Amino acid sequence: MDSQIKHAVVVKVMGRTGSRGQVTQVRVKFTDSDRYIMRNVKGPVREGDILTLLESEREARRLR
């Protein structure tokens, strides 16, 4: 299971989403590759934070 854990750096905070705005949509860059994806993050987050992603293939849908 440890091989699936990936670290990613928050590059840009895109905006708030969710029914009450409790989720933040962010663009992250993986530390071990040059790949960028969008993720939804619950809780406080800002640019430069390092996230530990247990599942790295799932990408969030864009905000409307």
From Swiss-Prot:
* Source organism superkingdom: Eukaryota
Q: Which gene encodes it?
A: RPS28A
Member of which family? Belongs to the eukaryotic ribosomal protein eS28 family.
Q: What's the name of the protein?
A: Small ribosomal subunit protein eS28z/eS28y
> Do the record's keywords include Magnesium?
no
Q: Where are the transmembrane segments?
A: none
Task: Cite the InterPro entries for this sequence.
Answer: NA-bd_OB-fold, Ribosomal_eS28, Ribosomal_eS28_CS
Q: Which GO terms describe its molecular function?
A: mRNA binding; structural constituent of ribosome
